[in-house]
Amino acid sequence: MAEILMGVGNAGLKESGNPDILVVYLPYPCTASFVFTDNYFKAGSVIYSERIARDKERIRAFVVNSGNANCGTGEEGIKHAEMMAEKVAQILDIPKDEVFVFSTGIIGKYLPIENVLKGIEQACSNLELLDLKRASEVISTTDRFPKYDFAKAGEVETFGFAKGAGMIHPSMATMLAFVFTNANLEYLTLKRIHESVTEKTFNSITVDGCESTNDAFGIISLGEVEADPETVEFELLKVSESLAKQIVADGEGATKIIRVNVRSAITEIKAREIAEAIANSLLVKTAVFGRDPNWGRIAAAAGSTEFPIDPFKLEIYVGGYLLYDGKPHDENLEKAKKHLIEDREVDITVELNEGEYEWVCYSSDIGYDYIKLNAEYTT
């Protein structure tokens, strides 16, 4: 396995005083694909890195600062992102256009750029082997725990780390995620796989329905082994789904992961829209927090999209227990309630009984601590 290096620095961006600068240094230029937030109010680092990604298919290093989003800071914010890339490139003696920049944290404050550049110098002077757990900790903001995973299938190794807990909503979330594969992938193949994986994972999670200004998800191919693209895609999907679920599990104030599976739809887009409506419903989320198998809220959310549903064909299951199929099944309410109380992952399945398409979204419950945390944390 190629030696990926990382360095950690401190620019004083976090109130806790914890390290807030991460530099990841690849042993050679690697094929990479990135997707960024769809939010029009983009951070300076997103604007800068998007410009590079449009013209560049390879990456040699990336730098992340945590604690300051560098967003709402105008042209100066973009310039600061460029200065961060320049500093990494200068110290590591690599092309500036092979250095990507990412920021996460509080919106609307200028980066103390001199401190950030000193933090980058510190990080680049203390390079060591990539530690997924440590990397996730450095880029975290309101996260309660680090997010990382590793998978191996034959010679194919897939691994990554992420951050995210609030402002989680499809397209994408308040999240950063970086996933690596040792498989050799041409750029167009990687891009196709990346788009598919993104839609099924990070674009199918929600915590609070709030879309962030700083999101990015990158997949980097180290090009060490030849492998079937389908195998590589499966492994990338597995690790990315794990990271996405960890983000949902860490939803601010969350006590449960909610898996919403809408099945037997006439089209995939219909299945997805209905799944997202249920996953985003505050009434569904609060019912789960209260351990209440309230299938009526699920039905109401399912019927709230532009796509019609037939209430006489509709089936609703919680924890595998049928609660509605054109009529209530109150005899299963206590079993469903027990599932909500005892299981960390709550399963909600909706059968439309009209076609063959399905979609899965992951969400979290929402309770008192979400309000407390976000009332006390400046965005």
Curated annotation (Swiss-Prot):
Q: Site Involved in the stabilization of negative charge on the oxyanion by the formation of the oxyanion hole: which residues?
A: T104, G105
Free-text function comment from the UniProt entry: Catalyzes two activities which are involved in the cyclic version of arginine biosynthesis: the synthesis of N-acetylglutamate from glutamate and acetyl-CoA as the acetyl donor, and of ornithine by transacetylation between N(2)-acetylornithine and glutamate.
**The protein's annotated pathway:** Amino-acid biosynthesis; L-arginine biosynthesis; L-ornithine and N-acetyl-L-glutamate from L-glutamate and N(2)-acetyl-L-ornithine (cyclic): step 1/1; Amino-acid biosynthesis; L-arginine biosynthesis; N(2)-acetyl-L-ornithine from L-glutamate: step 1/4
Site features described as Cleavage, chain residue numbers: A173, T174
Q: Which GO terms describe its biological process?
A: L-arginine biosynthetic process; ornithine biosynthetic process
Q: Which residues bind substrate?
A: T141, K163, T174, E252, N374, T379
| Catalytic residues in the record | T174
Q: What GO CC annotations are associated with the protein?
A: cytoplasm
Q: Which InterPro entries match?
A: Arg_biosynth_ArgJ (IPR002813), ArgJ-like_dom_sf (IPR016117), ArgJ_beta_C (IPR042195)
Q: Which gene encodes it?
A: argJ
Please give the Pfam families that the UniProt record associates with this protein.
ArgJ
Which cysteine pairs are covalently linked by disulfides here?
none
Quote the EC number.
2.3.1.35, 2.3.1.1
Give start-end of the signal peptide: none
Please give the chief subcellular localization of this protein: cytoplasm
UniProt xrefs under Gene3D superfamilies? ArgJ beta chain, C-terminal domain, L-amino peptidase D-ALA esterase/amidase
Q: Which family does it belong to?
A: Belongs to the ArgJ family.
Catalysed conversion reaction: N(2)-acetyl-L-ornithine + L-glutamate = N-acetyl-L-glutamate + L-ornithine; L-glutamate + acetyl-CoA = N-acetyl-L-glutamate + CoA + H(+)
Subunit composition? Heterotetramer of two alpha and two beta chains.
Task: List UniProt keywords, sorted A-Z.
Answer: Acyltransferase, Amino-acid biosynthesis, Arginine biosynthesis, Autocatalytic cleavage, Cytoplasm, Multifunctional enzyme, Transferase
Compartments (UniProt record): Cytoplasm
Top-rank lineage group of the source organism: Bacteria
Q: What is this protein called?
A: Arginine biosynthesis bifunctional protein ArgJ
Q: Whose protein is this, by species?
A: Aquifex aeolicus (strain VF5)
First-tier enzyme category under EC: transferase
> For this protein, what is any one GO molecular function term?
L-glutamate N-acetyltransferase activity
